[in-house]
Amino acid sequence: MESHSSLSSSSSSSPPSSLSSESCCVKVAVNVRPLIGDEVTQGCRECVSVSPVTPQVQMGTHPFTFDHVYGSNGSPSSLMFEECVAPLVDGLFHGYNATVLAYGQTGSGKTYTMGTGIKDGTKNGLIPQVMSALFNKIDSVKHQMGFQLHVSFIEILKEEVLDLLDSSVPFNRLANGTPGKVVLSKSPVQIRESPNGVITLSGATEVPIATKEEMASCLEQGSLTRATGSTNMNNESSRSHAIFTITLEQMRKISSISVVKDTVDEDMGEEYCCAKLHLVDLAGSERAKRTGSGGVRLKEGIHINRGLLALGNVISALGDEKRRKEGAHVPYRDSKLTRLLQDSLGGNSKTVMIACISPADINAEETLNTLKYANRARNIQNKPVANKDLICSEMQKMRQELQYLQATLCARGATSSEEVQVMREKIMKLESANEELSRELHIYRSKRVTLDYCNIDAQEDGVIFSKDDGLKRGFESMDSDYEMSEATSGGISEDIGAAEEWEHALRQNSMGKELNELSKRLEEKESEMRVCGIGTETIRQHFEKKMMELEKEKRTVQDERDMLLAEVEELAASSDRQAQVARDNHAHKLKALETQILNLKKKQENQVEVLKQKQKSEDAAKRLKTEIQCIKAQKVQLQQKMKQEAEQFRQWKASQEKELLQLKKEGRKTEHERLKLEALNRRQKMVLQRKTEEAAMATKRLKELLEARKSSPHDISVIANGQPPSRQTNEKSLRKWLDNELEVMAKVHQVRFQYEKQIQVRAALAVELTSLRQEMEFPSNSHQEKNGQFRFLSPNTRLERIASLESMLDVSSNALTAMGSQLSEAEEREHSLHAKPRWNHIQSMTDAKYLLQYVFDSTAEARSKIWEKDRDIKEKKEQLNDLLCLLQLTEVQNREILKEKKTREQTVSIALASTSSSYSGSSRSSSKHYGDNNASDDPSSPSSTYHRATKHLKYTGPGIVNISVRESEALLEETRKMKAMKKMGQSGKLWKWKRSHHQWLLQFKWKWQKPWKLSEWIKQNDETTMHVMSKSHHDDEDDHSWNRHSMFQGA
């Protein structure tokens, strides 16, 4: 970036059209990139709207107007180079410096837009297009001037300027395995300022360039060396500011022509100019919480934000018209980035700023800040001038003055105008007389030429000679007259004679040429005529020959016809009588044969009729047999079909019933899921509404505090600068101001916390919406997933859920946009306070001590309250633990009750088992023996259950043996009653036991055995059993209550 030492920006040595120092504003273009995959997955919505008619961007309630807007509904990004950068490339050839600046948050597409990340020969970005346009322009004008190109590529990493084209620094070299630390082989590049105020770089490498491929190689080398890293927002995030500079030097040849006394003097000179094009790719602003950076990445992000803050302060200072008119200080020296861009912002350069933004509402705060900075940059006034050599400009000016003086001298050295007028009149008279004589001479000579041609054609006539002599005499007289006129015309006659001789020679040559051409044409016509005559004779001979051949063939055919006629007549005369005799004999024979043929035909017809009748009877018999067999086969098939259809109907009915049961079951599940989703939807809406209201309240409170903050410092400054107030009033105002500042910071933190929570809520809603849409589009895949929680929902329920989620996403997006706008305004005002120190209005040590004491007291009080809150939290936790213990005890009690309920059900099954034994006709002892034997074999049988239940009732506690004995006697008594009922004819035969839902039921083998009587027996058995077990149940409850009391005391 080191400038040529002989260049100057003076406009006095240049033409006004090319070197005038006219102010021009910085051109600003906005490039809106599309939503990326991660943003779509998180459910982000576009918070930026672009007008398709005017270059205007609307974000919430903030409208912004720029020079160009690309992406979204604006112009396509492919037009960015033609509309923004191509005029800057053309200005390089006129000596104007230019700068293209890409600004925006991390992940907004700055590197992609500029093309500094070029790899593998890709052509994306503005820099490759600049290369192509630059070399195309050079190729078109290289015959008029000479060019020299140099490029340099630097980066600003952690406030250090590094050379990316230094071949001694290896690519991707790391120090101690720590990424992002490049080992330098020499000291960093130093920034210097020349005596004429031009910023230069000491130690930066400038590579001479001859072709576009060499420039692309330098760009690729620097891009590979540039520091990049991975963050949560960008896999290849630029960790430094990069500046790619193209220096164009051109020497133009200048010629000046002067005319002095009929002599031409051409003086050649050279015009030298030099211009630079800076292509700047800034690193993006980032938040550590969003990027998830730490360690080295965190330090890099801090330096990046610090440099961008300094750039924002410079833009604010240059964009404020009031401060610019007052000549306020511009903080260029706060950062090395702003120091290098000093000429680009408010200096000798034509600058285009490209603000790259993300339309996602999750980045609303950063996007609004970018738009605000870009809007301020439009007010920056630059003063570009053409950088041309002063010496060459002075020489050009002197050449112009010399030409003017030469023209003036020629005008003064001429004769007087009257003499010139007289001489012009004489010349005009002589020229008119000369023209008249020349016209007459031309007429006579044309006549003479015509007569000469006539003399050639009529040489045989004798009259020619007399005419020729007369004409000759006339010509001689004309010549004599002409000679006399020549004598009177003075010196002009000699010139006229020479001209006439030259004219005569020309005419003779032209007429000779015409005659030769006519002769050639005549010869050509004659040759064509001869050729035509020869061709006609040949054709006539050919046709005559053909006619003779045809006549000959005609005669031959006639002779053959005559011979044939004669032979036919001779044959007819010689064989008339023999033919008549043979004809009669043949006629008799023919009649006899015809009679025989008729008789044979009649016999044949009779035989054919007989054969037909026989064939018909055989066919009828075969047809009847076939029909019989077909009927039998159809009968068998019909029977089989009836059986199959009956079986199919039975299976179909069973499947339909099974499917109906399954559908009912799924319907119940679907209804249950629907109710759960409705409850979830209501809860989510309530939570979202509550969070939105909290965010709105926090945002409103923050806005009020920010409005109050505007007037608070002003009031304090008035108190400080005016009359000394009372101590009590001053302390009160300071206390109020400090409370307001602390409350603003707390509210900012609260709004930011709500903002992050809202992002998480919106992400969860987006994930659920995405899964629902995927299950709607691909239902076969969703059924196979383990977490297909929505697969039981009906399509209508899913559509309702999708609509509800979309509405909640809209509400969440609007809340995010509002909070992002308020956070942006809060940060902007915080930066303005940083630019103007917060504590400037504290004028005395007494105020500072009072504020310090107040802060100390507030901090001590806050910590005491925190300790009290922690103590309350601990107490609440202890209460919660007690409640959890009670809950566990309640669950244990519920389990005990369930066990008792199961025991009672087993007792009922025991009664059923004893009933079954009485119906089988077995005795009491055999039944007991059967139960004891089978208890060991089948633990799930009713008898084994009876055995375990009896044993359980028998040994559950002291004093229960008699109760179990009485219960056994009651059960046996019931068994005897059931045995008596067996004697009645209405009892059925027991077939088998069937276990269903952990209960033993009885089934009968035949329907006519009336199984409904079993319910009456079971009812009677239950009443008896419950009456016997009531007392035992009360005793058990007393035992359990004692156990619970002891467990609670132990806990």
Swiss-Prot record:
SUPFAM superfamilies the UniProt entry points to: P-loop containing nucleoside triphosphate hydrolases
Keyword Signal annotated: no
Recorded GO MF terms: ATP binding; microtubule binding; microtubule motor activity
Disruption phenotype: No visible phenotype.
Annotated Pfam families: Kinesin
Coiled coil: 414-448, 540-644
Biased composition (Low complexity): 916-925
Region feature Disordered, mapped onto this chain: 1-21, 916-946, 1029-1051
Keyword tags: ATP-binding, Cell wall biogenesis/degradation, Coiled coil, Microtubule, Motor protein, Nucleotide-binding
Positions annotated to bind ATP: G104, Q105, T106, G107, S108, G109, K110, T111
GO cellular component, one term: microtubule
PROSITE patterns the UniProt entry points to: KINESIN_MOTOR_1, KINESIN_MOTOR_2
Purpose: Kinesin-like motor protein involved in the control of the oriented deposition of cellulose microfibrils.
Complex formation: Homodimer.
Domain description: Composed of an N-terminal domain which is responsible for the motor activity of kinesin (it hydrolyzes ATP and binds microtubule) and a central to C-terminal alpha-helical coiled coil domain that mediates the heavy chain dimerization.
Protein name per the record: Kinesin-like protein KIN-4B
Organism: Arabidopsis thaliana
